[in-house]
């Protein structure tokens, strides 16, 4: 059993099987955290997977009675306690059950069909009509059921390893976990075969594991149409196998929609003896049309394999749109590592609500494997887009080598497509010997309409026509953008590339010191090559600089010192000069306003003419023009997105927590020894000013205290409190979550027969802060942790104008409160991470002075009232100052800004009711208002007199 557990879990850790070697997903990959989480989730969601995989019943067992082999009767099993069928062979059709229509609904406990078999069709159940499996509460288990012949003439009809249904199968609204494990059919539908399969509205997870169809149709599911919809828990297809569609084969449309839970296809395999066209294809899914739309949850295809076409999906039409993250990783096929698109098809890939990522997908069209994500056959159109903040990322190339006449392949076609379409070879090993690992080939007309098209880290494009109707073309170090021929004529006549908004990824260039290349690629498939005098590249417009997030790079790269000869662009042209730069303005580098390092770029061209060497593509062209730039820094301008006001807000969070505690202590003088417990709530609103953003803070906590007094009514008190607070910065998504522990001591001394009193308080607090920051429209996320210590002291004097024996008295008072707060240095994690260290701590001296009034009433229950009004000036304040440094650029600045107004009005109110002579309940409120800050502090609790 332990070996089986390791086997099932390993499918999430293991990458593609490449040339007999296993690639393990390590931290260096873009999705390693995701796969680690999936591995942990598998055994949590499906605790019975190992038990069922190894279970072998020794005797027949069934809780089904009556006629179970009549295709003319309808069977309804509703509100059963449980349903079990073990090791049955009741009929040639349906080893455990055969009927006209079947409904299994509202079962309280387990549904189990285990190790039944049929010698013709449907290992467990055959349904001539519809099968409804809905609203069941316990586990649903179909395991080890077989549809295998005992004579060769039955082989082609052995379909539906567990279930065969002539019409529709609906699996819906089930709360329990569904297991379809180790079911097998000689022909098709390893687990389920039906006309239409609907898996929808389930709140329990579902697993199709290790099912197989020996023929050409659907290792787990085979149907005319399949719809997986609105499931709130994950659905897994793991280790299923068939000749076509390792997990699912559908004659028409396969739809994944509105699923908030993940839909995972992992380690499925399509292979049969015939490895020709229309065989051994679709490692996970084989269908005419595949749609992944409106899924908030993740859809992932990992480590699926097809011996022929489409390591993950083989289809004619594919649409991915309005969905959360969609991942294609470690898949492989002979053609189309992840996706194979059949003739006259269409592919739409829109990263609207989450990223679409292709990583480490391979195909084996020749002796050696190459990285390929999508392979388009003849007359297949391609549309790709990404919305703001998202990306369609291809770490493996796309192949569209067949020309579509009079059609533009649209990239970022819609106005909302302001995101990034990224082609990157960042994860291709430097040891790769095949240039095809890096090249995306488009023998068509590509149009960029919005957003950003980016080529990075050695990625290459070969494109017949390219037009920039909008958006930005971003090129990084060692990227190549080149011409190619048309498929039908095998000629480059008419090949034109028009680029009018070019951006260079400056941090990438500074890291490798190699410029991206625009190239009139030579003709010829092998040596000797020759210059191609047909294509034209028109480069126009201003040149700009960006970083990986399409932001100004002046806070991403270290530009504090002058830099000479920065390689910006390399034009590899033919002798006749077919790259036109007459309307290209590199001087545009100095026209944009930006934050970060300020300075001046001095761009210049260097032109070199060489002798043609026809033995290599790279040495054929003779005209080399290289654009360089010299950088001269002039200063630094802090970007408000990076400024870091949120770190100062943590100081004020600690200050307000302790200041409110010290102000509250003046009300705590008790004549008799007491113990109290209370709930507390604190609200603070700090206005923004020209120097810093404001914030609002909410804190909830509790307090425990006790007081003791002497015969002369001198009292001593101690208080322990904890506050859990959240601070939210104004006009941003930055926040601070804190946990504060405070200990306070108080001494009260009455004098002159209690008409004059003095008190002193001392408080210390310790706070843990978790700071989260978000910037650049959510593109950048950082977080950090630190702690702070705050020390405060208060002295107060009051004079009662009337004796305490009177029902009403007034008491003028004056109080001095001093607070010091400091916090530790810390470093954020994430993109554009910063380091923070304290330059100056916070000091504050406030002197409230005002008047209190107290009275009591004894209607039914003794009740005491106390109100206070005070003027609250700040006599001394040292605002905190923090040194901030930005790791990505090496820049630093001093942060200071938020301040309290010098004058405020404070007010308090207290109501205490004695339910019993020694037990009272109370409600306190105190607040303050100034031009900068508003505070509200609430207490509700009980006091017991000893």
UniProtKB/Swiss-Prot annotation:
Database matches in Gene3D superfamilies: Autotransporter beta-domain
Cell compartments where the protein resides: Secreted, Cell wall; Cell outer membrane
One Gene Ontology cellular component: extracellular region
Bilayer topology term: Peripheral membrane protein
Record-linked InterPro entries: Autotransporte_beta, Autotransporte_beta_dom_sf, Polymorphic_membr_middle, POMP_repeat
Signal peptide positions (record): 1-16
Keywords: Cell outer membrane, Cell wall, Membrane, Secreted, Signal, Transmembrane, Transmembrane beta strand
Sequence ranges assigned to domain Autotransporter in this UniProt record: 668-946
Family, similarity comment: Belongs to the PMP outer membrane protein family.
Name assigned to this protein: Probable outer membrane protein pmp18
């Amino acid at each position: 059993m332990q070996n089986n557990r390791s086997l099932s879990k390993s499918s999430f850790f293991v990458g593609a099987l490449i040339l007999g070697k296993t690639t393990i997903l390590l931290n260096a990959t873009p999705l390693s955290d995701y796969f680690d989480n999936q591995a942990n989730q598998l055994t949590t969601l499906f605790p019975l997977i190992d038990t069922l995989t190894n279970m072998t019943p020794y005797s027949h067992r069934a809780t089904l009675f009556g006629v179970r082999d009549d295709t003319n009767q309808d069977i309804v099993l509703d509100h059963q306690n449980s349903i079990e069928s073990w090791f049955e062979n009741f009929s040639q059709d349906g080893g455990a059950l055969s009927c006209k229509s079947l409904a299994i609904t509202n079962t309280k406990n387990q549904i189990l069909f285990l190790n039944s078999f049929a010698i013709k069709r449907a290992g467990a159940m055959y349904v001539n009509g519809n099968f409804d499996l809905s609203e069941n509460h316990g586990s649903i288990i179909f395991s080890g059921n077989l549809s295998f012949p005992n004579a060769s003439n039955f082989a082609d009809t052995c379909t539906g390893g567990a279930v065969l249904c002539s019409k529709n199968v609906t699996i819906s609204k089930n709360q329990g976990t569904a297991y379809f494990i180790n079911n097998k059919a000689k022909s098709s539908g390893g687990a389920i075969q039906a006309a239409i399969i609907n898996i929808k509205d389930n709140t329990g997870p579902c697993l199709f594991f290790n099912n197989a169809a020996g023929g050409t149709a659907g290792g787990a599911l085979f149907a005319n149409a399949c719809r997986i919809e609105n499931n709130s828990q994950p659905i897994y297809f793991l280790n299923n196998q068939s000749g076509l569609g390792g997990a699912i084969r559908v004659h028409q449309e396969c739809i994944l929609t509105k699923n908030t839970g993940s839909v995972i296809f992992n380690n499925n395999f399509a292979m049969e003896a015939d490895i020709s066209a229309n065989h051994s294809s679709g490692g996970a899914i084989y269908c005419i049309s595949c749609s992944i739309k409106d899924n908030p949850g993740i859809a992932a295809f990992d480590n699926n394999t097809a011996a022929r076409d489409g390591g993950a999906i083989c289809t004619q039409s594919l649409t991915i749109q309005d969905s959360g993250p969609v991942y294609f990783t470690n898949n492989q096929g002979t053609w189309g590592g992840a996706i194979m698109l059949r003739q006259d098809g269409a592919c739409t890939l829109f990263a609207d609500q989450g990223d679409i990522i292709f990583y480490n997908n391979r195909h084996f069209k020749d002796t050696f494997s190459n990285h390929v994500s999508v392979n388009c056959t003849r007359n297949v159109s391609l549309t790709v887009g990404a919305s703001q903040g998202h990306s369609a990322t291809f770490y493996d190339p796309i192949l569209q080598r067949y020309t579509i006449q009079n059609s533009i392949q649209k990239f970022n076609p819609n106005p909302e497509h302001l995101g990034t379409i990224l082609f990157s070879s960042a994860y291709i090993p430097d040891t790769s010997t095949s240039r095809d690992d890096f090249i995306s080939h488009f023998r068509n007309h590509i149009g960029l309409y919005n957003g950003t098209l980016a080529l990075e880290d050695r990625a290459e494009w070969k494109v017949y026509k390219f037009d920039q109707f909008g958006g930005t073309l971003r090129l990084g170090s060692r990227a190549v953008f080149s011409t190619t021929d048309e498929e039908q004529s095998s000629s480059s006549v008419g090949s034109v590339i028009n680029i009018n908004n070019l951006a260079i990824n400056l941090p990438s260039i500074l890291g490798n010191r190699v410029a991206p290349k625009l190239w009139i690629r030579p003709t010829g498939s092998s040596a000797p090559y020759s210059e191609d005098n047909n294509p034209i590249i028109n480069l126009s417009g201003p040149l700009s600089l960006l970083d990986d997030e399409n932001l100004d790079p002046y806070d991403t790269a270290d530009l504090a010192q002058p830099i000479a000869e920065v390689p910006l662009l390399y034009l590899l042209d033919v002798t006749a000069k077919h790259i036109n730069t007459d309307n290209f303005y590199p001087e545009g580098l100095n026209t944009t306003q930006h934050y970060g390092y300020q300075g001046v770029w001095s761009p210049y061209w260097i032109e070199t003419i060489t002798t043609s060497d026809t033995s290599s593509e790279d040495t054929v062209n003779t005209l080399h023009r290289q654009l360089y730039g010299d950088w001269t820094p002039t200063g630094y301008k802090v970007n408000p997105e990076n400024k870091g006001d949120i770190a100062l807000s943590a100081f004020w969070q600690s200050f307000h927590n302790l200041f409110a505690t010290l102000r509250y202590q003046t009300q705590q003088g008790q004549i008799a020894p007491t113990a109290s417990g209370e709930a507390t709530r604190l609200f603070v609103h700090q206005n923004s000013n020209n120097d810093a953003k404001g914030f609002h803070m909410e804190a909830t906590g509790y307090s425990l205290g006790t007081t003791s007094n002497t015969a002369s009514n001198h009292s001593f008190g101690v208080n322990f409190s904890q506050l859990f607070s959240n601070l939210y910065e104004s006009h941003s998504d930055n926040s601070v979550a804190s946990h504060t522990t405070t200990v306070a001591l108080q001494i009260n001394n009455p004098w002159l027969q209690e008409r004059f009193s003095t008190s002193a308080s001392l408080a210390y607090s310790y706070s843990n802060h978790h700071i989260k920051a978000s910037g650049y429209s959510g593109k950048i996320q950082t977080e950090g942790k630190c702690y702070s210590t705050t020390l405060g002291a208060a002295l107060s004097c009051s004079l009662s104008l009337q004796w305490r024996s009177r029902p009403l008295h007034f008491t003028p008072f004056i109080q001095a409160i001093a607070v010091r707060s400091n916090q530790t240095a810390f470093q954020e994690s994430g993109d554009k991470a910063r380091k923070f260290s304290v330059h100056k701590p916070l000091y504050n001296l406030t002197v409230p002075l005002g008047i209190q009034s107290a009275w009591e009433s004894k209607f039914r229950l003794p009740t005491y009232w106390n109100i206070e009004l005070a003027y609250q000036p700040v006599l001394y304040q040292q605002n905190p100052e923090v040194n901030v440094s930005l790791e990505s650029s090496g820049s630093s600045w001093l942060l200071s800004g938020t301040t309290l107004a010098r004058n405020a009005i404070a007010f308090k109110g207290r109501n205490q009711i004695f339910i019993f002579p020694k037990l009272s309940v109370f409600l306190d409120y105190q607040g303050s208002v100034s031009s900068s800050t508003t505070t509200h502090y609430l207490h509700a609790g009980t006091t017991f007199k000893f």
